[in-house]
């Protein structure tokens, strides 16, 4: 398979590895992006790719709760200037109120619904675009319902750059639920517990860690023990309950929550622009600098 400059650029953005290393990784894996990431990790050249790395899109996240329902949403704009605009922030809050009341199941359903003003959600956004002069998009949202004995936690970081909604069961207070949300904003876990990690992801991580150990020249008879030890670190990276609690690193999140008589049922973490447009380095200049060295 022909390795294109665009493929090399994408792999660089995902891993932070050098251009020539990325080209070699893609060549060795016949252009398979995921296998190329693993190849770089096995060689110790790159860490695991972060999906939210190098975000450039603007906008804000917002959370609203009422009774036993909560909504978290992300609305994008083209510039940070507009995201801080009072009219934009009012629009976000009005969209949140509508979503919380109507509880649409999908984004398409939400955009087609009629608001209290008589306009559809899409028309309401279009009217704001005409006034503000910039493209505005309702990117995503989630409506969460809880039982009477459950507690929501809401945390907005940097004016909504990151938004986290948690749902705790048991005797948790809103303060505990918010503390957990704050931790999630900072540490970015992917799952609540080990039970949620897909077996395919564990198998892939195990294989990468095994190859890392073998490439380090470790004897095969101790490789498995090393893999198990490093898997523990993997779980600490991706599982909320395994992580050292950000406000008291002497205890894990599991210990902190259980000491309050609670359990974590669910969390949703939105970061503005994650997975969208990425920072553009001057790729042409880097290519030229590499060519000159040859």
Curated annotation (Swiss-Prot):
Keywords: Cytoplasm, Elongation factor, Protein biosynthesis. The keyword Protein biosynthesis applies. It comes from Geobacillus thermodenitrificans (strain NG80-2). Signal peptide: none annotated. Residues 79-82 are annotated as: Involved in Mg(2+) ion dislocation from EF-Tu. It comes from the Bacteria. SUPFAM superfamilies: Elongation factor Ts (EF-Ts), dimerisation domain (SSF54713), UBA-like (SSF46934). One of its GO terms (cellular component) is cytoplasm. It is found in: Cytoplasm. The keyword Kinase does not apply. GO terms for molecular function: translation elongation factor activity. Associates with the EF-Tu.GDP complex and induces the exchange of GDP to GTP. It remains bound to the aminoacyl-tRNA.EF-Tu.GTP complex up to the GTP hydrolysis stage on the ribosome. Pfam families: EF-Ts_N (PF25025), EF_TS (PF00889). Belongs to the EF-Ts family. InterPro entries: EF-Ts_dimer_sf, Transl_elong_EFTs/EF1B, Transl_elong_EFTs/EF1B_dimer, Transl_elong_Ts_CS, UBA-like_sf. This is Elongation factor Ts.
